[in-house]
């Protein structure tokens, strides 16, 4: 596993309701076979923590040593079955997801076919993809970044909430500028917040957003707060989406049976393709659409595209739109083509990503506590 890091210029000042984003951290899984063919995966959990990832990669590498790299589902069951006592829904699943993606990329490169063919072939000719950033507390930066996304071909943009009492003016500014041109997703980012808002805060925000045109409201509560999700649906007709930090179909089961989400979001670089398909199939049975969560590098982006093209109930996939140079080094073709909010099937072998070991020197990782989740409880939102 290689950890890459890029420090954002201070002028960007990326922040949201639960913390600040000072760095782009990319934990890359590189899987190599006996013939020196390689595949790439990514581990979303590695953005937040370093040491456990290293140990878990070593653990699963020993477990899979001398295994046939083409037996991908068997490898998943072997990893999960051997770790179930301590890894039912934890960080280990996230490491498994990164390995799973790397195995598919490796097989695609060896067979000289795109990953979507290994996943059963396309269900649709194109997939909607949205630009995901909006980590701003002022309309000027928000609108400039959204315009950057629009000029590339995006027609849906996601913004993060910083202050629930101030976000409506930003939403209003966006809708005025991009009316009939680009739609907006609002992410409350409470799913993994250290100090989440009171239930009333999220309900009041949803009521205010009713007057604005948005695609969906994402994670207005901590992911385990099923009652909050039930309550908010009594007060709003907005589409409510979640819960990206849940890694398995088994964990999503209660959310579907309790009907607390309108749109399911699983993280592609946590669940991987094997478990991601189970989540989508379960959602399909419950007539629920899926919006793939992909808050990572080009590896996660391409994984979301390949997967989304092959699954009937995937409505969106996500493109992490923070401004950094790492993606240019990982995209095989430097960028993906986006037109009128959609992207089509990639013309590539594997995922369409590449890796040079020298990237570790170009983007060196510095071990430290990540600031993406702040634990300060000095200002708890009550209304």
How would you describe each model-predicted region?
Residues 1-40, 44-45, 322-329, 379-383:
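Structured beta-strand/loop patches that form or line metal/cofactor-binding pockets in enzymes
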